[in-house]
Amino acid sequence: IGTRKLHYLLNTQADKTLNIGRDRLFNLLGEYRLLVPVKRAYHKTTNSHHRFYRHPNLLKPDPEQVTALEPEQVWVADITYLPLRSGTACLSLVTDACSRKIVGYHVGENLQTENVVKAFRQALRRRKTTGPLIHHSDRGLQYCSVLYQSVHERNGITCSMTDGYDCYQNALAERINGILKNEFLLSRPADLEQAREIVKESVAIYNHERPHLALKYKTPDDVHQAFYRQKTVNLYQD
């Protein structure tokens, strides 16, 4: 977790037993080598050389750009490799663009669409509204596939995709990947089963305990639940 967020959490404890300045906390963490180094390793997971249709980018800045003003208007999706002690697993994430909540995830043994679509289906099962929803991703084979697109069609979800190789066109999804891998998934799981347990715990902590600067130090679940108290319907079609 970042120093500013840790500073906020420490200074908002109910018992008020600790009061420390941000700079002092930063220096203290550095002195004891507790600052988490940012990892820059990059592994390509996107295969955009395929025959399937690529949807236009609805989130690209222009006069008709779509902006998420409340939860469950825009979801962003991405896939990242998860190193194991022997080999790798693949983590698929679906995140709400407004609340920053991870609404669906799945750890699979490979990049097959059957694994990636499980995160999307999980997110849809948990959804409690029926308003218009955009699913935004890169133009990788998995997201463009007949299987993945059929879930869009059955549930009335609008599809949006990046229009090139610019990672900034799916920056939020990339950012969530980085948070999980740099703050939570610091050690290599022994195998796929352990990876799934660690990711499950990490997602729960991220959603329910980690404050976000963009959310005025609220957690993603705080923002999402405040929205859900107003709207509670789900018509998911598998």
Range-by-range predicted roles:
Residues 45-48, 137-139, 145-149, 159-181, ...:
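RNase H-like two-metal-ion nuclease catalytic core shared by retroviral integrases
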Residues 153-157, 179-238:
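C-terminal domain-tail junction helix/linker
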Residues 1-69, 219-229:
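Basic, flexible linker segments flanking DNA-binding modules
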Residues 87, 105-128, 144:
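Active-site beta-loop-alpha junctions of metal-dependent nucleic acid enzymes
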Residues 6, 25, 59, 78, ...:
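Mobile genetic element proteins and their domesticated derivatives, centered on retroelements
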Residues 101-105, 159-162, 186-187:
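Short small-residue beta-strand/loop micro-motif enriched in glycine and branched aliphatics
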Residues 15-17, 64, 84, 139, ...:
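Conserved, non-catalytic sequence blocks in retroelement Pol enzymes and Pol-derived host proteins
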Residues 63-103, 109-110:
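An active-site-proximal beta-strand-loop segment
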